[in-house]
């Protein structure tokens, strides 16, 4: 009987040992899986934090760069009116000494406004001779032209402006079209 017990014990021992190893490995495998999952979650959280930080930095830079957009848009009418005032003075009055100082004052004011625009990243859109760009130009009329290629800006009714890389106001333009024969 003792031999039978020994035989049974020997047979049982190999069967119980893999089971014990499996039980020991199972918690380690489970812990390694959880550890890997937590590592991935930490990496994801770090990446998300970095993305949020970048987005906030960009929003902050945009806010400071474009903070004056509304005010700048309002000032464009001042620039337009100064230009109209200068254009309305006939050549014969420009030679008159009595008008000369007024003209000089208007020119200096227009130049100073242009300098302020430049310092704040506001630039005039060069429209004449350019191809119509719907992102910068607003076509108001098509004009027949034998000299210009169709789709080319041949008339500027109102100047357009950019503030840094954004459109502040589109240029109102006339575009060439093929003349009717």
Curated annotation (Swiss-Prot):
Record GO biological process: protein folding
Comp. bias intervals (Acidic residues): 1-24
Keyword field contains Ribosomal protein: no
SUPFAM superfamilies the record matches: Coiled-coil domain of nucleotide exchange factor GrpE, Head domain of nucleotide exchange factor GrpE
GO CC annotations, alphabetized: cytoplasm
Family matches, as InterPro entries: GrpE, GrpE_coiled_coil, GrpE_head
Record PROSITE patterns: GRPE
Signal peptide: none
Keywords: Chaperone, Cytoplasm, Stress response
GO MF terms, alphabetically ordered: adenyl-nucleotide exchange factor activity; protein homodimerization activity; protein-folding chaperone binding; unfolded protein binding
Superkingdom: Bacteria
Region (Disordered): 1-26
Record localization: Cytoplasm
Subunit structure as annotated in this protein's UniProt entry: Homodimer.
Protein family per UniProt: Belongs to the GrpE family.
Function: Participates actively in the response to hyperosmotic and heat shock by preventing the aggregation of stress-denatured proteins, in association with DnaK and GrpE. It is the nucleotide exchange factor for DnaK and may function as a thermosensor. Unfolded proteins bind initially to DnaJ; upon interaction with the DnaJ-bound protein, DnaK hydrolyzes its bound ATP, resulting in the formation of a stable complex. GrpE releases ADP from DnaK; ATP binding to DnaK triggers the release of the substrate protein, thus completing the reaction cycle.
Protein name, per record: Protein GrpE
